[in-house]
């Protein structure tokens, strides 16, 4: 993981504008967007149309980026809330792969309060629709070893839990390891429906977008729902009630099997425990990163109520 952060692209707005103009004749103003290991820019052309320029980490596999493009084209036939490709081509600039997708309007779910039941049901519905859209998609590059894959959760905990400074939190995290059932259904999943990747129309209070297919992986199908719930329940007075709304919406669009329902809460806890462990690993590499410490506070406060 540490190697990724040594190869983050370093383009400014002016160079991003020049890049898309030279490659594809798109002329517009560029504004940087948040990204952890890559670089994204919002591009607005003279007509007011908006695009997102995505500049990948130099260590990102080109085959995996091709898989992302293939997935976006595949799901675009069934859903309208995922980024669509503006240009099929993946260009290479200074060892970084470069793509352009359509901009999706909306406010991150993390910035919407309160999360009313109807909105949470819509989060579930949209995820169920995506699970259905991805159910017949596959690509060799998504069959990969990925540290955020829930299937690797026990290993992540074993490796990084010793780095968690708080002893009681460390013990709690170790207790979140799961025994996976061999019968659990597998498919390609988006893999990161956290509350900053889910976009909401703040007036209509419906989901308008799901961003960032960079964590896409072939894994447990129910993991898609578990990951979303892991973030929805944070700081909620009644986390189970909030989760039930998401589950209801999801199940209305995509059938859940009994063994998946049985594994849902263990996987929710596993995801949060993985987040604690991975953050501890990142803090070892970046001890001055106060954002990492602050971002974990909600998880540390919420996890005990889910045990």
Protein language model regions, located:
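Conserved short submotifs of the Hanks-type protein kinase catalytic core
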Residues: 94-107
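Active-site acidic catalytic loop and adjacent metal/ATP-binding pocket
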Residues: 36-48, 52-53, 85, 177-223
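A cross-family kinase active-site recognition segment
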Residues: 113-167, 184-186, 293
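A conserved alpha-helical element in kinase catalytic cores
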Residues: 52-96, 112, 117-123
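ATP/Mg2+ or Mg2+-diphosphate-binding catalytic cores
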Residues: 4, 275-307
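Active-site activation/catalytic loop segments of kinase-like enzymes and analogous catalytic loops
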Residues: 222-255, 269-287
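Juxta-kinase regulatory segment immediately upstream of eukaryotic protein kinase catalytic domains
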Residues: 1-27
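Protein kinase glycine-rich loop
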Residues: 31-34
